Every structure is written in structure tokens, then in C-alpha cells.
Amino acid sequence: MKYPISVQDFEKLITGKYVYVDKTDLVYELAQLNVCFLSRPRRFGKSLLISTLEAYFTGKKDLFKGLKIDELEKDWTEYPVFRIDFAGGNYAKPEELENKINNLLGNWERKYGSDELCQTISDRFKHVLMASEEQTGHKAVVLIDEYDKPMLDVIGTEQEQKNRETLKGFYGTFKEADKH
């Protein structure tokens, strides 16, 4: 019996034949919501849940064979998924947060196209979300892991205000682009 100690990747967990407590019926319920915010203590499986949602929304039906969600989901639609993981950076460094977001945006723009008129992070992200819907015919799914790390790294420092403004613009995109 293999226990998934520190395994945060759903595909690795399933294909590696690790012990898995099937709660995919709850994942199915969660996926029916338009917007969902989950806040849990450290080491509570948030990253694995994000990975599970990513596999679900990218239509990886084979990973869910024999699990509860396999009986519930009929369509297995593949959505454009934008996974953002802020866990890896040191956001106390100036420009680290903007560099991280710009790198993510650059990858997505290569996939879905860019618009030279979109110069700000929020405009670029909004354009990518709209372009992904136009190209796939499906609304985008945005999954964010460690959403608060860029702020936790800089509490009480000069960088705090800069990171707050960057995140405000970035997260503000969701309200503007809700229909995409």
C-alpha cells in the first residue's frame, strides 16, 4: 500500500497507484459553481485539489475511471485552464511578482494570441481569457494556488504596497472578464 505523502499531483497519485480517498463527487459539486474561494490551513490538500480540478476541467476522463465523478459527469468537456501557482517565488524581491505574472501571460499569449494594444497585466490577462473562449468555445477556468503568498512574503516591508497594487490589478481582471 503506497501512501501519497507530499504528492500534490492528481495524475501522479492515480497513475502511481497511491491510496486515494475518493471525494470526487464533491469535486463534481464544486465544479458546478461559477466562482469558488477555498481557504484552508497549510498542508490540507489545496494543491492536490487544484491539480484534481485541473485534470477534471481539461477533460482527463481516464484519470477518473472508477471514481465517483466518473458516474456523475457525462460530457467531459475540455475547458481552457489557467493554473497559477504562486508557491515558488520570493516575492520580497522587487519585480519578482510582476516577472512571475508576465511569464505566465507570455506562455498563455503564445497559446491564445496577444494584442499589442494590451500593455497592462490586467488588460493582457483579460485579452487571453477572451481569446481562449473565442478559440475553444468554452469559458476559461482559472485555478490559483497560494494566492496570498506574494502578500505574506512582504508584510511590513516597502514591497508590500507594490505587490498589493500588482495583485489588485491582476485579480481585478476576474470581475471584468467574468463572462469569459
Language-model regions, residue ranges each:
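Phosphate-binding site recognition
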Residues: 1-180
